[in-house]
Design a protein with these regions (language model features):
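Substrate-binding/active-site clefts of carbohydrate-active enzymes
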Residues: 1-75, 106, 123
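Active-site-proximal helices and loops of the catalytic beta/alpha 8
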Residues: 3-10, 14, 71-74, 82-182
Length: 183
């Protein structure tokens, strides 16, 4: 990406320091990443060096993605997007999800924020602490992977009692507004 620019695919001929964090400590994107030995060693998602980990709590990152008038979120919502799906929501800090939802609902009350959560999102534990996805300040709904798993289990075993139990667990655990909008 232009923000990290490890392969130097993006030019900084205007000298504004937009050549990416990998190429310059003066880059306005430098604080978005955590370098351990600049520039070649940095935190990456699951150790994959082509996926540098972004610091979603950095103020300038929050401004760029969420808060600024011309932020990524404002751009797409103003063009008619009605919401967003957060890939790998359990890898995002609570503060990021909460800030995103708060901003979306303030400007676009009918917008929807959906999270990719593979397990039961009502009691998800991620990195040692319970997530608050469905308590009103984060996600509107989630991908319904527990249901998918239950259906596959039924197709493999033919055990209707097991399927019924799994579906009932989802129904019992999810608030009605979430249950009625599962993906």
């Amino acid at each position: 990406s232009i923000y990290f620019n490890r392969k130097r695919r993006y030019d900084d001929s205007d000298g504004k320091g937009e050549n990416g964090a990998y190429n310059s400590r003066n880059s306005k994107y430098y604080r978005w990443y955590s370098f351990t030995s600049y520039p070649d060693k940095y935190e990456s998602w699951w150790g994959i060096d082509t996926l540098p980990k972004v610091n979603e709590e950095d103020e300038s990152y929050l401004d760029f993605i969420i808060r600024d008038e011309d932020s990524v979120i404002n751009h797409w919502l103003s063009l008619g997007a009605s919401g967003f799906r957060l890939d790998v929501a359990d890898e995002l800090p609570d503060i990021f999800i909460e800030e995103l939802r708060k901003h979306m609902k303030a400007r676009y009350p009918d917008s929807v924020l959906i999270g990719e959560v593979w397990e039961d999102a009502s009691n998800k534990i991620s990195y040692g602490y319970r997530r608050k996805y469905l308590q009103g300040s984060q996600l509107d709904s989630v991908m319904n992977y527990p249901f998918k798993k239950a259906i596959i289990g039924y197709m493999e075993t033919g055990d209707a009692k097991l399927l019924s139990g799994e579906v009932e667990t989802i129904r019992e655990n999810y608030p009605p507004q979430v249950l009625n909008s599962l993906m």
